[in-house]
């Protein structure tokens, strides 16, 4: 018997990113395993209401005020009526939220706990402790996860970061990495349709990502001119958009690199593979990274990886696929890039086996099965007392911080008052149940038979 699961996050299609693809691919594989999945996110321009995606995946686009980078305005309580209605209509058993910076994720967990549902949270990011934004997010996460059933982190570094930020027990935190659809990131076939635009005499370095300071954009604008001045046969392809885009334009003009640096701007995800296949090396200068899915995608296209060692990056790929910078600095990244260029130029490393290795290491079906194990565990071992409202309110009061714990307590009490009010105004037995999408479980044997 499958679970009825709701994924909650501010970030989903049509916006593209690592969290969005994680939610989509995980949901698709959960459906293949026989579970029912709906996604609850905010409206994106004309995407309002209910949308049905491949395999019967239902998406609720809730109209809500967006403040910054597709994050909705935090109100704690105002999303309760609509989220409660959806959870009851879809007969949800498990609420799975994603993203520390997502308002829908935080409020969804709070409302689900109040309704007595099982809750899971996946963290995709690393946060520090030395600026106002990080402190605010950490305090909010501490409140949200006080009564969580299980937390999933995408790397061991992310898990350690989560423990320090929220003081949760390590026993309820699991590590499940991201994955990649290796079929979508096949290396270039010289005899096929994807042909390299650059001359084979050139070494092409690819950079793909959001052009933000935390993604190393300031470092890249200083690294690229240095590498170009040292190697006449090196060219760059930079794909992505963000507030640092103009800095890249200025860098190209000031160093007269118009013929050696292509600035593509935002690239649709279905075109990312085509961009990667134009290169020999992938350069990743991120200042913070919990996992780094793009590294797996680049390696799947047989690119040699040059990267920093921040966060969970060292856990992602084997050493033979990567050249690490000793420090997150311009000089060390230039040195690592020069080393990778010499490896490619001398053909000291055969990268043609990278794709097969990555396809064996990362698979979304494996991620889904491990996630289902967590769902099964919290459903079978947890008791009804865990969701007793008096116990959960008491847990909020036990948190550290003389002001914080009183604020948590006040929010918890108001939440339960609102819960009882909604139960009286809109009784759950008067809410129509949504019909389930007809589905058939896809077994591994069936998939193998189809492939053969």
From Swiss-Prot:
Outcome, altering residue 297 to D: No transferase activity
Any one GO cellular component localisation term in the record: endoplasmic reticulum membrane
InterPro entries tied to this protein: Glyco_trans_1, PIG-A/GPI3, PIGA_GPI_anchor_biosynthesis
Any one of the GO BP annotations: GPI anchor biosynthetic process
Keyword annotations of the record: Endoplasmic reticulum, Glycosyltransferase, GPI-anchor biosynthesis, Membrane, Transferase, Transmembrane, Transmembrane helix
Gene3D superfamilies for the chain: Glycogen Phosphorylase B
EC number from the UniProt entry: 2.4.1.198
Catalytic activity line of the entry: a 1,2-diacyl-sn-glycero-3-phospho-(1D-myo-inositol) + UDP-N-acetyl-alpha-D-glucosamine = a 6-(N-acetyl-alpha-D-glucosaminyl)-1-(1,2-diacyl-sn-glycero-3-phospho)-1D-myo-inositol + UDP + H(+)
Family (UniProt): Belongs to the glycosyltransferase group 1 family. Glycosyltransferase 4 subfamily.
Record note on quaternary structure: Component of the phosphatidylinositol N-acetylglucosaminyltransferase (GPI-GlcNAc transferase) complex composed of at least GPI1, GPI2, GPI3, GPI15, GPI19 and ERI1.
Protein name, entry field: Phosphatidylinositol N-acetylglucosaminyltransferase GPI3 subunit
